[in-house]
Amino acid sequence: KELSRFAGWYGHNKERRFKMEPDFDPVHGADGWQVSNLPILSLAPYLASVEMFAEVGMDKLITKRNLITSYLEFILHEIDKELEGADFEILTPSNQEERGCQLSVYLHGQGRELFDRLMKNGVITDWREPNVIRLAPAPFYCSFEDMYEFGQILKELILNK
């Protein structure tokens, strides 16, 4: 089944493109979604990104993703055991293959207030209703030290409600 889409020059059948016919003859598949020439200058960052991924390799990124997310999970469990005021639960599955590099943490107590205080302390997280903070230790640019520092900041904020 074809979905509605813009009828662009590069989405038109290559064999008929230069015939300049009034009807759109779509290319099937992903190529059919192209509308026009790609703006070359805005693509430069993508090239750098692709080169970085190629240099590091997906296997290494996946390994670090699993290790750093497990470390963050460990830190959260330790805070939960250590502090009486830590009233949260990790919603994301513990199985590494089911979660990628994100942990969704349900906050029973402080909710949005804790999120706002984390942001004021330089911790970039994501807020979702109801009362969920999403933590994403991206393996390309987050370090294990970043996770440790996050844990220290979180403990401090919970202790000083």
State the predicted function of each range.
Residues 1-64, 70:
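Active-site C-terminal subdomain of aminotransferase-like
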Residues 1-3, 107-110:
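Short loop segments at secondary-structure junctions
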Residues 42, 95-97, 127-130:
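Short, flexible turn/loop "capping" segments at secondary-structure junctions
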